Curated annotation (Swiss-Prot):
This is Large ribosomal subunit protein bL34. Belongs to the bacterial ribosomal protein bL34 family. GO terms for biological process: translation. The gene is rpmH. Pfam families: Ribosomal_L34.
Amino acid sequence: MKRTFQPTVLKRKRTHGFRARMATKNGRKVINARRAKGRARLSK
């Protein structure tokens, strides 16, 4: 059985990247929440 996590940088960026987050209203909410919390990394 193959492992479920087969990392691909492009896929990661497209779904969890900064620009992907900024593209939607809820994504912007995520970024703002992480800014308010003081996260060093806002997105992948």
